[in-house]
Structures are given as C-alpha cells and as structure tokens.
Amino acid sequence: MIYTLTLNPSVDYKIVLKEFQEESLNYALNNNFFAGGKGINVSTVLKNLGKPSTALGFLGGFTGDYIRFSLDSRGIKNDFIKIKYDTRLNIKMIANGRETEINANSPDISENEFELLKNKLKNLANNSTLVMSGSVPAALGEDAYNEIANSISNDVKLIIDTSGKPLRKILRLNPFLIKPNIYELEDLFNAKFDSTKELIKIGKNLVESGVQNIIISMGSDGAIFIGGKNVAFRAFVPKINFVSTIGAGDSVIAGFVYAFDNGSTLEDSFKFGVAAGTATALKGNLCEFQDVKKMLCQIRVEDIYTS
C-alpha cells in the first residue's frame, strides 16, 4: 500500500493573468482552487496514473473541509487528523511570463494532534511505501519527520521530499529515496554546484552516507539518479516551453513510485518519474497517464556511474 503524508497542506488558489500591474485593478484570464500540498499532489498524480494511495496529514477549518471534499470527489482515499485551526490558503500567480507564490503561515498543531497522527502511522502495514513531502509546520519543529520515522516499522519504505533543516535531519534515517533540487542541495551544503560532475559527486557522497537512492532535479536540464551498487543515471528532457513547474517535482515522485511499485527497475522508474514531471510542467496541471506515456519516448537516460 502507498501512503502520502502532507504535514502542511493548503488550498491553492491558482490565478493566471496576462500581466500584473502593481497598484492597479487586474483581471484574471482564469482562476481555480485546488487541494494543495506536496503529498496531496503525489496522491493526485498516482490516482491519475491508476495507482491507489491514501493521503494522510492534518486538516482543519473550511479550507480543510474543501481539501477533504476535493479528494473524496476524485476518489482519492484520505484519512487526515482533524485539527482545531484552519488549513492555510496559498496563492499561485502566473503573470508576465513568471510564476509568483505566496504561502500563508501554517496553523498551530497541538501535541495531542501530532500524537494522534503518529499513532495512526504506527499501524502502517509492513512493506508499505510512505511518501513524506513538503514543509513542516512551525508548531511541530524541524525534527517532526524524524519523530514520525522513528514511530513506524522499519519495513516501511520511506520516500522524503523536503528542504532546509528537515532535509538535513532526515539524512540519518537512511531513507529509500530523497529528491532535492540543485538549490536545495546548495542550501544543504552551503555551497555552489556549477557542474553536473559536482552534483554526481555530492549524490554519491549522500548515498555512501546512508541515503539509499537520490533523484536530483535540474529543471530543464533533466535529472540525475544515484543509487547503491554502482547505479547512476542522467535523464535528458526535450527542449520545450514549460507552462508551469508547479507540481512537477511531486509528479516525479509519483511517477517513480508508480513504476517501482509495478515492478520496474530503478532506471525505468526514474525515467517514468522524469517523464511525469516533464509532462506536468508542459501541461501546466498535474499530469494524466496519457501525458506521461506520450512524454516517455522523449526522455533519454544514460548510465553515468563512471562520469
């Protein structure tokens, strides 16, 4: 069984304008509300690909009710802990050919509410996959992912997509997969990586330190996969005009999990994940199965272990 965990979900208000003029009345070309949060995005893409999952985390208030209704209406199983305060509302604006995001503060989460979540996660079946994605609410502290990981079975496959201090903390957990981008790695190591060779080296160092597999996303330059047992690949993506990168990284995770859970090799799972992420960026919305299949033949993967 596949589970996704979103500690800091949101209702995302996506608004598209031809151009944005400050201190003036602006009219949207289109606007929509979405159930947001990285883990929720992973569950949504998995559903689009035909793979069931259960979305977990915290929801509260009218915004939380909207997310639950949205997931229920799409047939995405969910089992969130209900909290006292409202789930946040985030704004994603596309204007003047650029993306701007405004994220609201996370709600307060009580110690009792956190304990309820950890107790729920203790009961995950052996051989399950748990995808923990996104930021950690300030009320829980930067050790939240570690506390959760320590409360579940060692037989649960941990996939973690986060950044900053929570990313640094989870490296000691020996997760099955992490997926930082270049900027998150630069922040993690307080260094600048100017070449693919440097990224490969740092990826190998992370694997040697205990991370089982790592996907380093490089935007329009594709992605790198580093694993144990002399496994290293680079994926090249077609030169296309991306509509929006929002949700692309979550689609990479979902595509990888989908393929690997179906018995694909690490290489093929990586390729499918990159195809999913690229399809989402090209479409501007979370990809569907046919989008990924169409993109798959345009993704080229090379073995780079000796690079």
Swiss-Prot record:
Active-site positions on this chain: 250 (proton acceptor)
InterPro entries assigned: 1-PFruKinase, Carboh/pur_kinase_PfkB_CS, PfkB_dom, Ribokinase-like, Tagatose/fructose_Pkinase
Disulfide bonds, paired cysteine numbers: none
Top enzyme category: transferase
Keywords linked to the UniProt accession: ATP-binding, Kinase, Nucleotide-binding, Transferase
EC number(s) reported in the record: 2.7.1.56
Catalytic activity: beta-D-fructose 1-phosphate + ATP = beta-D-fructose 1,6-bisphosphate + ADP + H(+)
Short name of any one Pfam family annotated for the protein: PfkB
Entries under Gene3D superfamilies matching the protein: 3.40.1190.20
GO MF entries: 1-phosphofructokinase activity; ATP binding
Family: Belongs to the carbohydrate kinase PfkB family.
PANTHER family documented for this protein: 1-PHOSPHOFRUCTOKINASE (PTHR46566:SF1), 1-PHOSPHOFRUCTOKINASE-RELATED (PTHR46566)
Protein name: 1-phosphofructokinase
